[in-house]
Structures are given as C-alpha cells and as structure tokens.
Amino acid sequence: MSTVVVKGNVNGGVQQPRMRRRQSLRRRANRVQPVVMVTAPGQPRRRRRRRGGNRRSRRTGVPRGRGSSETFVFTKDNLVGNTQGSFTFGPSLSDCPAFKDGILKAYHEYKITSILLQFVSEASSTSSGSIAYELDPHCKVSSLQSYVNKFQITKGGAKTYQARMINGVEWHDSSEDQCRILWKGNGKSSDSAGSFRVTIKVALQNPK
C-alpha cells in the first residue's frame, strides 16, 4: 500500500488566495496617497464698526439748523485821555456791524455768554490818568455811576465777564439789548490813550 503525500504550494493551493489578498491590499495602500489641499491666502476680514446707540451724545456744539455759536471781535480806536462812551450789547451794538446787522438778524433769540474787555495802551510814558468802566447788566444806566474799576492809561489791562454777570444765562429776543458797559477817562483831551478791544461769545437759536 502506497501513501501519497500532498505538499502545499506557497504560490498556489490553499495559501495562494491569502497571499493575493495581502498583495492587493498593499497595492491599494500604495496607490492611495495623501492629498494636500493648498488654499490661496484669503483677504483680511473687514471689521464692522459698532454703531452705538448714543452717537448723538458725542457731537458737541449746537445741532445744525437749530442754533449757532459765534465769536466776534471789534475795536474802539483813537481814545483820548478824557474819553467817555458805552457799549450796548445787542441790536444797538453799532461798533460791531457783523453782529448787529449780520447774524443777529437771522435768529429770533440770542444770549451773549462772555465778554472780554481789553484796553490797549498807546499813551506816552509822560501821560497820566485812567479810564473807569462799569457794567450795567440790565441797560438801566446811561452814564458812568461808579469809578471803582479802572484802566491806567499808561498800562492797559483786561476784564472778563461771564454769563451770570452780564445777564447772559437766559435767552433774549433779538430785538432787545442784553447789557451795557460804560467808561469815562479823567486824563487830558490832548493825550492819546489807546483803544478798546472787545471779544464776545454769542449763542443763537430759533433761526428766522
């Protein structure tokens, strides 16, 4: 009796399908390659501005179309030692046409909130005397009544009046004067004294 021994073939037989599967898996693994995605550099994102609910509160000054705030400067020249006169602030301020005949006629109401009165001396060192001045906040006085406040003719000086001192807290009708400053010198008529330089700040409302 003869015995037949069947040896398995590595490249065939039972083990051959397993080898083929492994080889096919390796081939697939080799075929699959990682894909690298290259993206173009994007544009920077625009940041949206936050719109606050109180944007109006950041605005300063008087809203357009409702009012205005202006500053006027005028001078009174060629004053002598015994000069006297007055500034009536309002529609009677003839020394400042830009205010009297200009912007004041464009509004129904106004108030002067600040007055700077400066005396610029042009007197010689040999001159003597002074110029007294007085504030009348209600335009009731027509001539100088007090000699307490003075400018020395040879030195000059300045005086600032705020709103509460010049009746400038409340609004005034554009046809009414607000206040007055009077002055009078005690020097000689032959002596040159100098000039006044006046700066006023005006608020206006209710345009015509």
UniProtKB/Swiss-Prot annotation:
One CC-aspect GO term: T=3 icosahedral viral capsid
Keyword tags: Capsid protein, T=3 icosahedral capsid protein, Virion
Keyword Nucleotide-binding: no
Subcellular location: Virion
Low complexity composition-biased segments: 1-17
Function as written in the Swiss-Prot or TrEMBL entry: Major capsid protein that self-assembles to form an icosahedral capsid with a T=3 symmetry, about 23 nm in diameter, and consisting of 180 capsid proteins monomers. Most of the 180 monomers are the major capsid protein, but a small percentage contain the minor capsid protein, which has a long C-terminal extension.
Similarity-based family: Belongs to the luteoviruses capsid protein family.
Protein name: Major capsid protein
Organism: Potato leafroll virus (strain Potato/Scotland/strain 1/1984)
Taxonomic path: Viruses, Riboviria, Orthornavirae, Pisuviricota, Pisoniviricetes
